[in-house]
Amino acid sequence: MSSLYSKLSVLKDDENFFLNSRTNKTVKEIQKELNITIDEAMVLSIIISYQIQDTYSTSFDSLKKDFKLQSDEYLKYLNIAYKLEKKGFIALAEERRRGRSSRISPEFNVDDMIFNKLILGYDYLDDVDFSDIYSVVKVIAELIYKKDDKKLTEFRLVSEANRVFDKLDIKEEFT
């Protein structure tokens, strides 16, 4: 997955991205890795591309300008972005949370765990000792803390907890 960095970083400069995105191998790879729809993978991919090249957050309005999107296309992709936000893959930038930008031209940033997994190739579950009950409980507690701290949505908490449980070998005895 770490090779995604170079593949994603150039998407921002592809003026035909939205026309060709459904057949883009990088978009399909992200769709498969995160188990999301092709449209969600497309929007997430372009937000990551902007985030890699420029700043911590991506002004969604810049997509409209850079890709010359018509209003109905822009609203379609914006709706998908809000679905990604609800699922916890992206978050509204802090300025938006304080009410400094509108719902029609928000700024988003990619969740740190998603960014680390896709770009850096780091999955926090690789550091968990699944034979140690305390290690498993600790990672679940950290997820709950992130949810309480509004850094993780309920949807993502459940999906991340399920990832932990899926990696847990029920037959294995804890030490």
Positions of the model-derived regions?
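Intrinsically disordered, low-complexity N-terminal extensions of AAA+/P-loop NTPases
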Residues: 1-175
